[in-house]
């Protein structure tokens, strides 16, 4: 599941890996408030500030930004004169500006990435993520080859029930692998 931090980093076009960002978010003691999110953005060397917008004037803000909406936080992706597009818990939502202003508390976190804004040890984390992906694909390929060879050698698909039972067992192995 994408976290608020990884969603915001994606919208800011910051080089990051989901595994590091999600782990940082999960382990941060203040992950559900603006202080915590600000602290996490500082790890990525992103200048940021929490602000209170008087009269909820959205024109004062440049997207993307994090907004406090209905006791939760959302990442506002873009705004127009008619609508506000934001991401809330991995759901992309578009609402009229007036409706958004009713939901919004006027509190926002704005960020200004610089040239040095990136994940600490990004290359190392990216390489680790790539190795993990290759390992998963390799295991799946080996299982498929073994399945094909085994079914050919032992005629596993000669009956419908044999094939069905094999499919159920493989589905169980797949679920436990995830």
For each feature predicted by the language model, list its residue ranges:
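Membrane-interfacial helix-loop segments of redox and metal-homeostasis proteins
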Residues: 139-178
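Residues within well-ordered alpha helices
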Residues: 7-8, 40, 167
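Contiguous, structured surface segment used for ligand recognition
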Residues: 1-2, 30-60
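Noncatalytic regulatory segments and standalone regulatory/sensor domains
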Residues: 1-12, 17-18, 22-32, 59-154
């Amino acid at each position: 599941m994408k976290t608020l931090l990884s969603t915001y980093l994606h919208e800011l076009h910051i080089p990051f890996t989901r595994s590091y960002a999600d782990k940082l978010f999960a382990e941060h003691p203040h992950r559900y408030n603006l202080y915590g999110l600000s602290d996490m953005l500082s790890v990525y060397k992103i200048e940021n500030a929490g602000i209170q917008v008087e009269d909820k004037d959205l024109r004062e803000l440049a997207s993307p930004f994090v907004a406090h909406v209905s006791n939760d936080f959302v990442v506002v992706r873009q705004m127009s004169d008619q609508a506000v597009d934001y991401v809330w818990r991995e759901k992309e939502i578009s609402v009229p500006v007036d409706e958004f202003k009713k939901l919004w508390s006027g509190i926002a976190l704005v960020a200004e990435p610089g040239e040095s804004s990136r994940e600490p040890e990004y290359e190392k984390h990216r390489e680790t993520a790539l190795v993990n992906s290759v390992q998963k694909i390799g295991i799946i390929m080996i299982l498929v080859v073994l399945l094909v060879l085994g079914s050919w050698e032992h005629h596993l698909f000669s009956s419908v029930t044999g094939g069905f039972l094999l499919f159920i067992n493989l589905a169980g192995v797949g679920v436990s692998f995830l």
